[in-house]
From Swiss-Prot:
It comes from Staphylococcus haemolyticus (strain JCSC1435). It comes from the Bacteria. The keyword NADP does not apply. The modification S-(dipyrrolylmethanemethyl)cysteine is found at residue 241. It is an enzyme of class 2 (transferase). This is Porphobilinogen deaminase. Coiled coil: none annotated.
Length: 310
């Protein structure tokens, strides 16, 4: 196998999960020579704005995809939730490896549980999906926008006026943070995860047969089926980070997949949610999106997308 160059964002988390995936490849073939090329994306450069207000899709992947087209790198290791549902022609997701915990972690000062926070308590999150779901269940709380890496957010919780923050559990675990700092993991009934949360997507050129063969050895088809249902739903609903959208699929023991999709208004007042069970992940994602559209969820998305365009 030729020497491989892996493209990664330069955040600590991105580099850590890239290295963890490289270790997985080297476990399959210890002779592999692999180097990481750090790439700065548009999303990394925007630190003073809420991502949902920036607009566009693929804020954390476009520059990396360009390097694949330019043959500067051989593969890209993405957090799958950052990857738009349509992959550009000429590129492919060569593998979906094992998935980390897909849920969100709730971390509060003095470990006060979410349902015991006093009225007006401030929760920090950078995600419309998290904010909307929290407000729908706890309208007495306040959501305040927070950006930055894990260390920065934990520091802000300590020294600023946040009473709690909510982060993806996967990032905390990949970075080696112990469960001790987490007040609780929020299961899907409290906070439905983002599409593809906890999963990685390994992107490469569609015609790179040698690399695709290697990647197939660390591919997890069960996880791929789940995220396919989730990403089909995202695509069918024309979802983006301007929209509070969630989706989570699990494999059932009988070989079927259960998928729940969710669309909300950012203020948490309107909630459209539906669950389907079936064998074909694409059909599942499309079926749930059809039901939510019939219920009127698409009007929320259209309105938010139009507001973004102006």
């Amino acid at each position: 196998m030729r020497k491989l160059v892996v493209g990664s964002r330069r955040s600590k988390l991105a580099l850590t999960q890239s290295q963890q995936f490289i270790d997985k490849l080297k476990a399959v073939d210890p002779t592999l020579e692999i180097e990481i090329k750090e790439i700065v994306t548009k999303g990394d450069r925007i630190v003073n704005k809420q991502l949902s207000k920036v607009g566009g899709k693929g804020l954390f992947v476009k520059e990396i995809q360009q390097e694949l087209f330019d043959k500067e790198i051989d593969m890209a290791i993405h957090s799958l939730k950052d990857v738009p549902s349509i992959i550009p022609e000429g590129l492919t997701l060569g593998c979906i490896p094992d998935r980390e915990v897909p849920f969100d972690a709730y971390i509060s000062k003095n470990h006060i549980p979410l349902n015991e926070l006093p009225d007006g308590s401030i929760i920090g999150t950078s995600s419309l999906r998290r904010g909307a779901q929290i407000l729908s269940k706890y309208p007495n709380l306040e959501i305040k926008w927070i950006r930055g890496n894990i260390d920065t957010r934990l520091k802000k919780l300590e020294i600023e006026d946040y009473d709690a923050i909510i982060l993806a559990a996967a990032g905390l675990r990949r970075m080696g943070w112990s469960d001790d700092i987490v007040t609780t993991y929020l299961d899907k009934d409290i906070l439905l995860p983002a599409i593809g949360q906890g999963a990685l997507g390994i992107e490469c050129r569609s015609d790179d047969v040698e690399l695709l063969e290697l990647l197939s050895k660390v591919h997890n088809q069960a996880v791929a089926n789940c995220v396919t249902a989730e990403r089909t739903f995202l695509s069918a609903m024309d979802g983006s980070c301007q929209v509070p959208i969630g989706g989570y699929a699990t494999n059932k023991e009988n070989g079927e997949i259960e998928f729940t999709g969710l669309i909300m208004t950012p203020d948490g007042t309107k909630r459209y949610e539906h669950t389907e069970v079936g064998k074909n992940p694409v059909d599942l994602g499309e079926a749930v999106s059809r039901v939510l559209k019939e219920q009127g969820a698409y009007e929320i998305i259209k309105k938010l997308n139009e507001e973004q365009a102006h």
